């Protein structure tokens, strides 16, 4: 994995990041933005080795996730977007291709919206314009807000391991990583996870997604049970994105890591051309 470091940002705090600077000083920078309840490593471990050969790579653990910033403030996607740009300032990075996975998609899009000149292009993976357009979705979020805090308190390492075991086929190269994945998931702050879910439930980029105006690619997971493929296609249409469709569920990065890596590499290449 790329080397890790703590980046201190005035008025914000200390952030755990991975940053690998390419030997080519002119190599573009790719910022990897992870999903809800994940962290940079468990979302992007399959792609690190390939990306560092061609790009400088920045990976950030968002607030309350993994080794991310702990704060008493209510979780906001906008704060996460601003965090990444503030980290870029400290590292002397002028612009990035923002690769957003699931929740990382909204964070990447908000970076582009709020910091126009800092995002060269977007790669949006297994994500959507919104998650609450239907009554059923809104009901599920409401139930989740009530149940989630209790569920997280009762979740044991054994239950997490059982969940991961059920999601990763034995044939996957990631199957042997189960103990590590469990330990990484346990780093998350349960209060922040609940807050982040609430923030996602309120996110709606439909009024402004078409105005971003940057090269965009959308990696659509065609068997996704968490973010419906039709929602992913709606995002791609709104952002005029090049679509790369792959045969996988929401955790395709664990289930088919080689397929996921190939799609990410292809998507970045297309938006950088």
Describe these PLM feature segments:
Residues 113, 121-151:
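Flexible "cap/lid" loop of the alpha/beta hydrolase fold
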Residues 45, 49, 58-99:
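Active-site loop/oxyanion-hole signature of alpha/beta-hydrolase fold enzymes
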Residues 240-273:
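Catalytic active-site module of serine/aspartate enzymes centered on a nucleophile-bearing elbow/loop
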Residues 1-14:
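N-terminal cap/lid segment of alpha/beta-hydrolase-fold proteins
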Residues 100, 104, 108:
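Gly/Ala-rich beta-loop-alpha elbow adjacent to hydrolase catalytic centers
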Residues 48, 215-248, 254:
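Conserved loop-alpha-helix segment in the C-terminal half of the alpha/beta-hydrolase fold
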Residues 16-67:
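Conserved HGGG/HGGXW glycine-rich cap/lid loop of the alpha/beta-hydrolase fold
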Residues 133-138, 153-211:
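Conserved alpha/beta-hydrolase catalytic His-Asp/Glu region
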């Amino acid at each position: 994995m790329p080397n890790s470091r703590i980046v201190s940002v005035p008025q914000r705090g200390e952030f755990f990041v991975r940053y690998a600077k390419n030997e080519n000083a002119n190599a573009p920078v790719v910022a990897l933005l992870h999903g809800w309840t994940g962290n940079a490593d468990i979302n992007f471990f399959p792609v690190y080795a390939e990306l560092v050969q061609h790009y400088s790579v920045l990976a950030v653990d968002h607030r309350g996730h993994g080794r991310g910033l702990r704060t008493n403030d209510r979780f906001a996607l906008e704060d996460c977007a601003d965090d990444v740009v503030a980290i870029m300032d400290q590292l002397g990075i002028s612009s990035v291709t923002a690769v957003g996975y699931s929740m990382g998609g909204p964070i990447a899009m908000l970076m582009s919206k709020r910091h126009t000149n800092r995002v060269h292009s977007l790669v949006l993976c297994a994500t959507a314009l919104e998650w609450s357009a239907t009554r059923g979705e809104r009901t599920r979020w409401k139930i989740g807000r009530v149940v989630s805090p209790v569920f997280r308190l009762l979740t044991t390492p054994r239950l997490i391991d059982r969940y991961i075991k059920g999601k990763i086929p034995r044939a996957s190269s990631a199957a042997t990583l189960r103990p590590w994945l469990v330990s990484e998931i346990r780093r998350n702050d349960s209060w922040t996870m609940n807050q982040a879910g609430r923030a996602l439930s309120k996110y709606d980029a439909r009024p402004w997604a078409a105005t971003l105006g940057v090269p965009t690619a959308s990696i659509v997971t065609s068997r996704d049970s968490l973010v419906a493929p039709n929602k992913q296609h709606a995002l791609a249409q709104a952002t005029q994105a090049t679509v790369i469709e792959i045969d996988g569920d929401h955790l395709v990065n664990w289930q088919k890591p080689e397929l996921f890596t190939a799609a990410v590499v292809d998507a970045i290449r297309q938006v950088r051309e």
